[in-house]
């Protein structure tokens, strides 16, 4: 007779790891996108500034 407890623990650990990955990846992707936008805006600003001067 096998125990259901190890399967239950494995399921909870897998679920916790999945939630952790989601909660870590989503802010990371958003942060990278925001940094990319910031760099692009800065490059565009300095390109326009160089054209004026």
Curated annotation (Swiss-Prot):
Gene Ontology MF terms: cytochrome-c oxidase activity
Reaction catalyzed: 4 Fe(II)-[cytochrome c] + O2 + 8 H(+)(in) = 4 Fe(III)-[cytochrome c] + 2 H2O + 4 H(+)(out)
EC numbers on record: 7.1.1.9
GO terms of biological process kind: mitochondrial electron transport, cytochrome c to oxygen; response to hypoxia
Organism name: Dictyostelium discoideum
Domain of life: Eukaryota
CDD domains found in the cross-reference section: CcO_VIc-like
Keywords annotated in UniProt: Membrane, Mitochondrion, Mitochondrion inner membrane, Translocase
The protein's name in its UniProt record: Cytochrome c oxidase subunit 7e
Subunit structure: Slime mold cytochrome c oxidase consists of at least seven different polypeptides species, subunits I, II, III, IV, V, VI, and VIIe/s in order of MW.
Localization per record: Mitochondrion inner membrane
Function: This protein is one of the nuclear-coded polypeptide chains of cytochrome c oxidase, the terminal oxidase in mitochondrial electron transport.
Enzyme class, UniProt record, top EC level: translocase
Primary localization class, coarse: mitochondrion
GO cellular component: mitochondrial inner membrane
């Amino acid at each position: 007779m096998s125990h259901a407890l190890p399967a239950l623990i494995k399921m909870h650990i897998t679920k916790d790891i999945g939630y952790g990955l989601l909660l870590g990846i989503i802010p990371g992707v958003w942060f990278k996108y925001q940094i990319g936008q910031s760099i692009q805006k800065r490059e565009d600003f300095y390109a326009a500034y160089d054209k004026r001067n």
